[in-house]
A protein has these predicted regions:
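Short, low-complexity interaction segments enriched in Ser/Thr/Pro/Gly
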Residues: 1-2, 39
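Acidic, metal/ion-coordinating pockets
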Residues: 28, 32-414
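Sec-dependent N-terminal signal peptides of Gram-positive bacterial secreted proteins and lipoproteins
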Residues: 2-28
Length: 414
């Protein structure tokens, strides 16, 4: 299995990336306190919790008191340390495989009112919602990034006047771990549906599950944090921001100096600064943007403008969500932009969907291939084959001039 780590860092903490060292802790053993914590910060370690049960995904954990821990040792031997309330895995020896895969999926929700297919998960488990090939694509990714389009909370109150407000019980976050989720993207227009309480519950829940999140946080430094995915000596930075609710006082609050919320990109100045900052520390930088107009098959004026700005800032790939439908692919000054992955596990209608698989060459750090894998959301999610697969690829090709998409979904600039 590929050895990897994900580090979530603020600008100040990112300067410590080079100090991350390898840890070697046998399964079932305890790390000496405070040495694990000293990997990243000098704060005194409080405790090391040992997690003896099986874990379904690399970053899933179960612990009695995760909030007070400095480190957790999972049954697989993976050590997670903390920096500013986030779980961090230590860098390990390079794997013999010289490529890593990052899979992006679009909108997901586990609320049965908005996604009736999720009722299957409540009765039979999340695995029953995906066919074998789709499940293998998700769990087989070295890094899986999902757009988590709702808060995990039993509290809070719905945003007054907002037409659609969603929430799911905190325990359902376990399903993210079972799916193999490595990063939950929270910069969207629903994470704040149940106000500050709902947002804070979401952050606590994901911390407890050991699932890193980006795009929202307890304050602006937290919300702006970059995820640094490190494997085989290669670092890929991932940023997440939203422009949705394009008005001065949006329902979804922007994070402040001392208040929770999302990382907004209505004005891309700060996001572009974060891209440039990330490129100083990482080999590649990917932006996952929540943008666009619902139900439009191609990008709108704002996406066009912002894609240009993000590309000029140094983004190597831009991936989008929010429109609830698949949108076109375009190259902007040589930078691939997949404007919208659409709904993935969201909504009641049968809908074409899919995932974007990014393959990174770690010998000469670069994106070696981009593949769109067509899928169908209907009674769960299944991978398309034959004529239906080709139909979706043909439709994507028809709205993506300047791009060549082959029969397997691999695409390149014409």
């Amino acid at each position: 299995m590929l050895k990897k780590k994900i580090t979530l860092m603020s600008a100040a903490a990112a300067a410590l990336v080079g100090a991350v060292a390898a840890l070697s802790v046998p399964i079932g053993a305890s790390a000496e306190s405070p040495s694990a914590q000293e990997i990243m910060v000098k704060a005194a370690a409080e405790a090391v919790l040992e997690c003896g049960e099986s874990v379904a995904a690399e970053f899933r954990k179960r612990a009695m008191d995760p909030g007070g821990a400095s480190a957790i040792i999972t049954a697989s031997g993976k050590v997670l340390t903390r920096d500013d309330g986030k779980w961090i895995t230590p860098e390990q020896e390079p794997d013999s495989d010289r490529e890593i895969s990052i899979v992006f999926v679009g909108d997901i929700i586990f609320e049965t009112g908005q996604n009736p297919w999720s009722s299957i998960a409540y009765s039979d488990g999340i695995r029953a919602c995906f066919d074998d090939e789709t499940w293998g694509t998700l769990t087989g990714a070295d890094f899986l990034v999902v757009n988590n389009e709702f808060p995990y909370t039993d509290g809070g109150t719905p945003t007054p006047g907002k037409t659609f407000t969603f929430r799911c019980a905190p325990w359902t976050a376990e399903w993210l771990g079972e799916m193999g989720t490595d990063i939950a993207a929270l910069a969207n227009n629903h994470v704040y549906d149940y106000g500050e309480e709902g947002a804070l519950d979401t952050f606590d829940t994901l911390d407890e599950q050991g699932i890193p999140y980006i795009g929202a946080g307890r304050n602006i430094d937290d919300a702006e944090q970059t995820a640094y995915c490190i494997a085989n000596g290669t670092t890929v930075a991932i940023l997440n921001a939203t422009e949705i609710e394009r008005y001065e006082n949006p329902d979804t609050r922007e994070a402040g100096e001392d208040s929770p919320g999302v990382f907004r990109m209505l004005d891309t100045t700060r996001l572009c600064e974060k891209i440039r900052e990330a490129k100083e520390k990482a080999d590649l930088c990917i932006v996952y943007a929540h943008w666009g107009t619902e139900k439009m098959p191609s990008q709108d004026w704002s996406q066009t403008t912002k894609a240009q700005e993000l590309a000029e800032a140094g983004a190597d790939l831009i991936v989008g969500s929010h429109p609830h439908v698949l949108q076109n692919i375009e190259y902007v000054d040589g930078v691939p932009v997949f404007y919208s992955l659409g709904n993935y596990f969201f909504g009641a209608a049968a809908r074409d969907t899919g995932v974007l698989r990014v393959t990174v060459n770690t010998e000469n750090p670069s994106i070696s291939s981009l593949q769109f894998i067509p899928m169908l959301q209907y009674r769960g999610v299944s991978t398309m084959e034959g004529s239906e697969k080709q139909r979706v690829l043909d439709e994507m090709q028809s709205v993506s001039p300047g791009v060549v998409i082959d029969e397997d979904g691999y695409f390149t600039q014409e």
